[in-house]
Design a protein with these regions (language model features):
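A contiguous loop/helix-start segment that scaffolds small-molecule binding in enzyme catalytic cores
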Residues: 2-4, 72-74, 82, 146-226
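Short loop/edge segments at beta-strand edges and connector loops
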Residues: 53, 105, 128, 185
Length: 226
């Protein structure tokens, strides 16, 4: 058996009961170091822990796949929710196993940020840049999102395209630098790490950051008047 599950945005309090049950009954728990650390208190002492990084993930997932094919209960843990951000890792798991695997949803950092920032997804678009390959199509989509008067929640690419790079790219494409921006690094806190405008977003943030770019003109309420 092998299952891939999201574990929430970085704190065990956001772990779903379904994911907790899977992890607590696993023979093998695998994932990137920071993700495994989130659920380490739930992993049974009898379980084998397989941690990985960007450079050795293919070899480590092949190790997990061998355990799966040997009949062990394997759980691969993902930060947030797999289908919000992490689909390329899921592809690697399935390639190693040679078949499609079951996925279990988690709570995404985008959902927590929407709650913290008090924005709703009918007025907000979510984009993840946390992927390998060409980002240009996704960035062009981000420009259209902002031109359409919507908010944007954006997960940066931690190794080379962070909030300051996103802001600089947008401003260079004539997106107004006056868009209000929030960057969050720890979503268990009640306040953003940084608030300002797109034009002022020039500082460095950790690889756990997520960005909210607000529309210049918030949508008016469409509920009936009191």
């Amino acid at each position: 058996m092998i299952v891939c599950t999201g574990v929430g945005p970085g704190h065990v309090d956001f772990l779903t009961r379904w994911a907790e049950e899977l992890i607590s009954e696993a023979d093998v728990v695998a994932g990137f170091d920071a993700v495994v650390d989130v659920v380490r208190s739930v992993i049974p002492q009898s379980a084998e822990i397989v941690t990985m990084g960007y450079k050795d993930q293919v070899a480590k997932l092949e190790e997990v796949a061998r355990a799966h094919h040997a009949g062990k209960r394997c759980v691969v843990v993902f930060m947030g929710d797999i289908h919000f951000s992490g689909f390329q890792l899921l592809e690697r798991v399935e390639r190693a196993c040679g078949h499609a695997v079951e996925t279990v949803p988690g709570i995404s950092s985008a959902q927590i940020l929407a709650s913290r920032g008090r924005v709703c997804f009918d007025e907000t678009t979510f984009l993840t840049l946390h992927r390998r390959g060409d980002l240009e199509p996704f960035l062009r989509h981000l420009v259209h999102v902002l031109e359409d008067g919507r908010n944007a929640i954006v997960i940066p690419r931690p190794w080379d395209f962070m909030p300051k790079d996103i802001a600089a790219w947008l401003v260079a494409r004539f997106v107004s630098g006056e868009h209000p921006v929030e960057v969050w690094e720890n979503l268990t806190r009640s306040e953003a790490e940084w608030r300002g405008t797109l034009g002022d977003c020039t500082r460095d943030f950790s690889d756990m950051s997520i960005m909210l770019i607000r529309t210049l003109t918030p949508m008016a309420s469409q509920i009936e008047s009191a």
